[in-house]
A protein has these predicted regions:
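Short, extreme N-terminal segment that most often corresponds to the first beta-strand
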Residues: 1-30
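Charged interaction segments
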Residues: 23-40, 44-127
Length: 127
């Protein structure tokens, strides 16, 4: 039987000016499609979003249209990771904290449900 881990994370980022999508993908990791998995090259060291056996989390980027607002960007990462749990959760926490270190974070939280754990895990950014 498969082990599933369900993830919902949101990052509210502050900036002076626009944060480029490229810098977000560089910090968070790129999304990988099923075709990318089929042609996956282990020597490729490009950072990816956290990944289970059937693929990674998905990511959505929203930019505030009011360019004068400090709360400029919201990034959400979400999905269901198969064959991922237990000690992998520490890697997920490290990923979350590494993402937060790259930007001025107004607010960030991640809710994780490991189907084999007793309780959900909530990780929040604290400066």
């Amino acid at each position: 039987m498969s082990q599933w881990t369900h993830v919902a994370a949101i990052f509210r980022l502050d900036s002076f000016g626009k944060i480029s999508d490229e810098s977000i993908y560089k910090a968070f990791g790129k999304e990988v499609t099923w075709d990318d998995l089929y042609n996956y090259d282990e020597s490729d060291d490009t950072k990816t979003l956290p990944m289970g056996s059937e693929g990674p989390l998905e990511m959505s980027i929203w930019h505030n249209s009011d360019e004068g607002c400090m709360a400029s960007t919201t990034v959400s990462a979400f999905g269901d990771l198969r064959d991922y749990g237990g000690s992998d959760i520490d890697k997920l926490k490290d990923w979350f904290n590494d993402c937060c270190k790259q930007f001025m974070v107004r607010q960030a939280v991640m809710h994780v449900i490991d189907e084999y754990a007793d309780e959900p895990i909530i990780v929040q950014y604290v400066e």
